[in-house]
């Protein structure tokens, strides 16, 4: 008789298990990828095809957004180290899996409603529309990264601490954090344009 040998679980940063994470928002669950990977680095394999961003690990999407600012452009190892340190801080403060905190933050920071401009007879009229789930995830990750940048750039606060605080506040739905405040602002503008 042969014994079944199970493959060892691949943990993110050799520490965090993604199999125990649940996404509470069913609308974005399809677009938040939680496949296990030791180092979140796909080497650009998913960039050439449309909508394959949904197959990218959500942690790598956050890392890529952190690299978009002027000072961090192309510094992926630095961004990976920032996220790894921020996850440690999140775990120390909340005693939860930081990947689950990230998923809750993405669910709370993504706007559900936005406005588009329609042109009627030469006049631009704002119109409220529902946001697509993939755009909600993209916008949420971008707002989290922008909040981290605004909290830490040219300030004494380390980037990892700013990211940890932003993730915890966004996961709790705190309106004082940048990403949730921007989401509320967009939804308020969309509500007035109905």
Swiss-Prot record:
SUPFAM superfamilies cross-referenced by the UniProt entry: Ribosomal protein S7
Disulfide bonds: none
GO cellular component: small ribosomal subunit
Ribonucleoprotein found in the keyword field: yes
Top-level taxon of the source organism: Archaea
Sorted UniProt keywords: Ribonucleoprotein, Ribosomal protein, RNA-binding, rRNA-binding
Signal peptide: none
Gene Ontology MF, one: structural constituent of ribosome
Pfam families: Ribosomal_S7 (PF00177)
Any GO BP annotation: translation
Family, as annotated: Belongs to the universal ribosomal protein uS7 family.
Functional description taken from the UniProt entry: One of the primary rRNA binding proteins, it binds directly to 16S rRNA where it nucleates assembly of the head domain of the 30S subunit. Is located at the subunit interface close to the decoding center.
NCBIfam families registered for this protein in UniProt: PRK04027.1 (NF003106), uS7_euk_arch (TIGR01028)
Subunit structure as annotated in this protein's UniProt entry: Part of the 30S ribosomal subunit.
Protein name per its UniProtKB record: Small ribosomal subunit protein uS7
Upper lineage: Archaea, Methanobacteriati, Methanobacteriota, Stenosarchaea group, Methanomicrobia
Gene: rps7
């Amino acid at each position: 008789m042969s014994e079944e040998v199970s493959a060892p679980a691949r943990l993110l940063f050799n520490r965090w298990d993604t199999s125990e994470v649940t996404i509470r928002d069913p609308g974005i669950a399809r677009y938040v990828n939680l496949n296990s990977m030791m180092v979140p680095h796909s080497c650009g394999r998913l960039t050439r095809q449309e909508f394959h961003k949904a197959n990218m690990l959500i942690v790598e999407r956050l890392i890529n957004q952190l690299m978009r600012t002027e000072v961090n452009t192309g510094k992926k190892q630095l961004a990976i180290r920032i996220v790894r340190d921020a996850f440690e801080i999140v775990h120390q403060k909340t005693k939860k899996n930081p990947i689950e905190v990230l998923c809750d933050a993405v669910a709370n920071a993504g706007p559900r409603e936005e406005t588009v401009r329609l042109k009627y007879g030469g006049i631009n009229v704002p119109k409220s529309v529902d946001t697509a789930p993939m755009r909600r995830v993209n916008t949420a990750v971008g707002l989290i990264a922008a909040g981290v940048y605004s909290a830490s750039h040219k300030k004494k606060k380390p980037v990892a601490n700013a990211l940890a605080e932003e993730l915890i506040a966004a996961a709790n739905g705190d309106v004082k954090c940048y990403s949730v405040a921007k989401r509320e602002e967009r939804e308020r503008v969309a509500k007035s344009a109905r």
